Amino acid sequence: MTENHYLLLTPGPLTTTKSVKEVMIYDWCTWDDEYNTMVQEVRAKLVSLATKEEEKYTTVLMQGSGTFSVEAVIGSVIPANGKILVCTNGAYGKRIVQMAEMLQIDVVVSQTEEWEPTNIVEVEKLLQEDKEITHIAVVHCETTTGIINPIVDVCKLGKQYGKVTIVDAMSSFGGIEIDIADLQIDFLISSANKCIQGVPGFGFVIAKRDELLKCKGQGRSLSLDLYDQWETMEKQNGKWRFTSPTHVVHAFYQALLELQKEGGVRARYNRYYNNQKLLVNRMGEIGFKPLVDEEYQAPIITSFIYPKQGFEFQQLYNELKRYGFVIYPGKISKVDTFGIGNIG
């Protein structure tokens, strides 16, 4: 097997440490007590990263990509008579809308341009006009562009109007400090292969216990039933209902230890932030402009606008890959861009 020397300048999967890779050499049994104890430690560590009020929250691990965990939340927490307001300004907000529609859940959309943050004024207007809305969902860092959405304001509004709050923090959790109790987030979703710097294979939901308990019997899918998954893990000491990605869990546990060793989320944020600023400055020197205004830019990934003349993305991609760097193609619908990630 050829050793991979590429540095992934992407928003996840990303470049992992040698020590994270090495723990995946060994095989583990899903029924083993030592393994299940590790699962419980992972669940507890995630809650402690998310809030100081740990007793109010719990973690559910879910096999698959981060999208599986998002769909588990959408399909499990909204009752048959519920309605969700989705704030969208990119591919991942739109994906939540698609999920709701596929699951035949009533959905209202607050949409802004991909380079603009969620419009709080419009969100409040929709909440005032539509009393049937029960839940509100927003993407924290929209990976499409690297824009940060105002989750503090969105969640505050949500609670002001008595709604359940859902935050897709796929590309921000572990890289940007968040206290979900302070922000009044009921369900936060992220993935193993993002800012905590593990490998792909499972996502996780950090849920307010009181709200999660209301989800019993509401799941619209067997394998993506969030409550049933939690209940099994809770009552059977970390057991998953179906085969779990044992190697990925071990890699994630190691990645959590390395996050702690680095100095925690604040230290990691500072590293990402400094790298992102350096990247934008150096790219600016050779004529590349970022899509998102600095005020709304996350340190996770930066979208750069194609120069108007003489630019071929595939040529840039191939040349960078030849030198050992892999970047991210653009996913913007109205503007030609490419992305460079700072995580990993």
Curated annotation (Swiss-Prot):
Keywords: Aminotransferase, Pyridoxal phosphate, Pyruvate, Transferase
Superkingdom of the organism of origin: Bacteria
Cofactor(s) required for function per UniProt: pyridoxal 5'-phosphate
Keyword rRNA-binding: no
Residue numbers of N6-(pyridoxal phosphate)lysine PTMs: K194
Catalytic reaction(s) noted: (2-aminoethyl)phosphonate + pyruvate = phosphonoacetaldehyde + L-alanine
GO MF assignments: 2-aminoethylphosphonate-pyruvate transaminase activity
BP GO annotations: organic phosphonate catabolic process
EC number: 2.6.1.37
EC class: transferase
Record-linked InterPro entries: Aminotrans_V_dom, NH2EtPonate_pyrv_transaminase, PyrdxlP-dep_Trfase, PyrdxlP-dep_Trfase_major, PyrdxlP-dep_Trfase_small, SP_NH2Trfase/AEP_transaminase
Function: Involved in phosphonate degradation.
NCBIfam families: PhnW-AepZ (TIGR03301), PRK13479.1 (NF010006), transamin_PhnW (TIGR02326)
Subunit structure: Homodimer.
Protein family per UniProt: Belongs to the class-V pyridoxal-phosphate-dependent aminotransferase family. PhnW subfamily.
Identification of the protein by name: 2-aminoethylphosphonate--pyruvate transaminase
Gene expressing this chain: phnW
